[in-house]
Amino acid sequence: AGLLRIVPPETIIGLADDDMYYYPNWFKASVDLMRSYPNVGQVSGWPVRTQMRWGNNFTIKWARKYAVYEEGKFIPEQWDRDFCTSIGREWDFHVHYTKNDMDKRITYQGIPAYAVAHHCQFVCKAGNLVEILRQNNEAMSDDKVLDNAVDGAGFLRLTTVERYVRHIGNVLDDELKPKRKRHA
């Protein structure tokens, strides 16, 4: 948090776990989304359905008032399968575990986003993160604590509808192995 206090508040920073894979244009897509919505606290580049269980109450409340809000199964099955592979979860268990979960998608001024961000990877304005840490000095101590702190501070948490980032769980699967050289 000390470094955040010396950079200008409008500086866009990125935080991520070390086992993330980035597709081309991930940063631009995230920043473009951030600039398309008001009062954004976080933008992630990969939607995960189970993440939509917490930390998005403010975003959903805002969306119902100012945007188009939809619930459904919008995330492609393959992305769900990739998520399962990255965390070592069996597909059949995941299908059962998430059977009642719905994706929460919003559209504001023609720009779609998911109503969630992921603590494993996000971009934000440095000043917003400083404000969140002022309100909750334990926000960086746990993933859900951060997610809920951003939500509780009244910031939108968004994810691109296209997958620009992917959790790889420190293992490259057969699809990602050939890409490691191309994007290095």
Report each predicted region and the residues it spans.
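Active-site nucleotide-sugar/metal-binding loop of Leloir-type enzymes
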Residues: G2-I12
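Conserved catalytic core of nucleotide-sugar-dependent glycosyltransferases
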Residues: Y23-K125
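C-terminal catalytic/acceptor-binding lobe
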Residues: Q78, S86, W91-A184
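Short, high-confidence coil segments that cap the C-terminus of an alpha-helix
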Residues: P9-E10, P38-V40, F155
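Acidic metal-phosphate-binding loop of nucleotide-sugar-dependent transferases
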Residues: D19-Y21
